[in-house]
Regions:
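Nucleotidyltransferase catalytic core that binds NTPs
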Residues: 1-168
């Protein structure tokens, strides 16, 4: 497994992997991987011949009363788990600037009225942050396929809607 921590390393690795035949599947995560995440890696491997996982604790999806700093970070364990699943590439940005450059204007996506309902009522701005980072990962990686968990139907619906709209 190739581990990348900078945008430059990511682009270089993706360029090398693009020379190989087959599709690339993306599995975005925030780390602290469990069996559900690993099942997504397995599913990605069924859908594509090359897999990339990301571990990025996205500060944009945490609200004022949610503690971004306390989110569990288990990087070494996560790396070992992904190696066992034969994930090809892992992108663990060393800092937020590797995802959202200071030079680029941050394009925050609006989840609309659906993002303000259900879970969005108690976590205002959460889905805007999720959509913004997933869109950015799509821009950086340009996967053929992306695999997401199904535990949060609202999030899954919003991501699918965004992907169809911005990445047809």
């Amino acid at each position: 497994m190739v581990i990348t921590r900078t945008r430059e390393e990511l682009y270089k690795t993706l360029k090398e992997f693009s020379k190989l035949p087959g599709k690339l599947a993306l599995v975005p995560t925030m780390g602290n991987l469990h069996d559900g995440h690993l099942s997504l890696i397995k599913l990605a491997k069924l859908k594509a011949s090359k897999t990339i996982a990301t571990i990025f604790v996205n500060p944009l999806q945490f609200g004022k009363n949610e503690d971004f700093k306390k989110y569990p970070r288990t990087e070494e364990l996560d790396i070992e788990k992904l190696k066992k699943e034969h994930c090809d590439i892992l992108f663990i940005p060393r800092n937020i600037e590797e995802v959202f450059s200071k030079i680029e204007k941050l394009k925050t996506l609006d989840s609309g009225s659906l993002g303000s309902e259900l879970c969005g009522k108690i976590r205002p701005g959460h889905f805007d942050g999720v959509l913004t980072v997933v869109n950015r990962l799509f821009e950086l990686i340009n996967p053929d396929v992306a695999v997401f968990g199904a535990k949060d139907y609202q999030q899954q619906f919003l991501i699918k809607k965004m992907a169809i709209s911005l990445h047809p």
